[in-house]
Amino acid sequence: MKKYIIHSLVILMTLLAFSTACSKFEEMGKNPYALYDAPSESFVHPIMFKTQYSLINVFRSSTALLMQYGVSTNSEVSSRVIDNYNIPEATTDDIWSTLYLQWGNAVQMHQKAIEENNPAMQAVALIIKSFLITHITDTYGDVPFKEAGQLVLRDDNDVYSTHYDTQKDIYRDVICMLENANEMLAVTERLKFSAVSDKVYNGEFDKWRRFGNSLYARVLMRIAMKVIEEDGGVLELDDKWEAVSVAQKLGELYNNYQNGSGDYPQMRSMEDRPMVPFSELNETEHTPFFTMTSGNWNTLAVSDVLVARMLDTDEKVDSDGITYHQYKPSKYNVLSPGSGRVEDPRYDSWWRKANGLPVHLLNDARVRFLDSDEHKSQAGNSRVGRMVRGKNPSTGIEETSAIWGKIYDLQNASAYPLMQYSELAFIYAEAGARGWISSISGFGGYMNLLKDGITQSILEWNPYVKVDDPMVVEYLNYCVNGALYSGQTFNSDNALEAILTHKWLAQFFIGIESWCDYRRTGYPLLKTNGPAAGNDQILPTRMRYPSDELYRNPQAYPEALDRWLGGTNNNKSDVWWAATAESYQTRLKGRQ
């Protein structure tokens, strides 16, 4: 068998090298994620596993810090801390070096399905390609795409340079790919392919179709503000597909979402989520955190911003003059009638203690905060929460959470979602609040979707609660009736802030999604001008291209820099869909 290995770039995936034949089943067993000259369906699980392996790692190492879910406790100089907007080269490369590899494999998978005359597997490949290339372009902006895909399929290695497509053109093609995928899966007579090849959906084409159309809703929302501002809301596509009105198409998808079927069926419940499995028993299926020591795992602390949003707290000022929020236990913590205070039922699923670390502290101030007796228990233990981890691998002791003392595991979970079902409710709530979908443009319409999104997110994260549990019901009422949105209760004027703040919470551990929403809308409102904030107090708008691109792509790379980055590979230029007046003005509030 020929084993396909897609090499590092012009992009890592642009060349395809063929290794010698492999005849030993033992060798295949040692590396089940190498891609062989096998049926197209054999590509599915290796690509999905490696993609999610990368994205959960990116969330913990980058997104969690940029989006103020967490704060680094490393005692290095503050100028090198990611949450202070100083991005090291290795972090800049993360998405590029991993997802381009898998995108190249998806290109190969698609070609295989064409050669097999297998439209259903072509559709699955198109969905995977769309998922991957949107993550790549959302991270960097303009990137190699069309020519790069052609190079993947070439047998020679004479050409290394490839054009950088504009993000707008990439999104045109993504919409066409998702339309084509939906069309092919709508007419396929096959119900399944091999479950062995697909550990996400067990080979069920219907669920792949629902995932593809759910991704379509995300894609439309991603570009809608820009297309409306730039093109009056209509995006031209290719010769096959007519121009798409983003608001009208979102309305069409919403009707299908509401009905659970139709021409664009989408996820119906959390059971339809794309859950990628991991295993502690198989070394080829370990999470990226499997061998992480307690010391390294605990370098990520919960941010004070997140604590103040999710829990009932008192604002305090410590002896060093640092403002922070101190948790006030609710009646659910002591399991008896009490103050009636409420707390987010998801908090326990993420953090082991209930106080947070303020963002953007200078290194000395951060060290003093963590070392201060004011922020420790009587036993001398820090009150600042770290991520839940299930079992401590060094001691074998199961570690419990902050509020209920339950056991959750983020370090070595059995599966992680690529996309949450709850995201759809937030997408359509936003579309309703913006007046893009008339049937839900009234306050009650998008409020119900907001409440449904919050409820579904709680159920996605906390297996110990049910919809009608008092803790869930009272928290939901608090989200609507509490003065949580710029000091006001939920109303039509602050609806976008409310919807997108709760969407931010719901996107915990989902790759780069909350970072994309922030750049697109400016929500949640995040303070970006703290004492240690770098990058001119601008939360990074993109990741820089890898430093070796000038060497690997000497013609196209400088052209891309000059075309849209002003000649400088920077973290401050907006990608195409984020460059709107509304987004800029909302993000500016964080520096005021």
Located regions from the model:
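Bacterial Sec-dependent N-terminal signal peptides
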Residues: M1-K30
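Membrane-proximal, proline-rich intrinsically disordered regions
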Residues: C22-G70, A90, S97-Y100, Q108, ...
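Structured, solvent-exposed acidic/aromatic patches
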Residues: A38, T73-I128, L132-W461, T489-N494, ...
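Long amphipathic alpha-helical coiled-coil segments
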Residues: R190-A195, W515, L526-K527
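Bacterial extracytoplasmic/cell-wall-associated proteins, especially those involved in peptidoglycan
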Residues: V342, D348, L500, I510-S514, ...
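C-terminal structural cap/anchor segments
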Residues: R434-R519
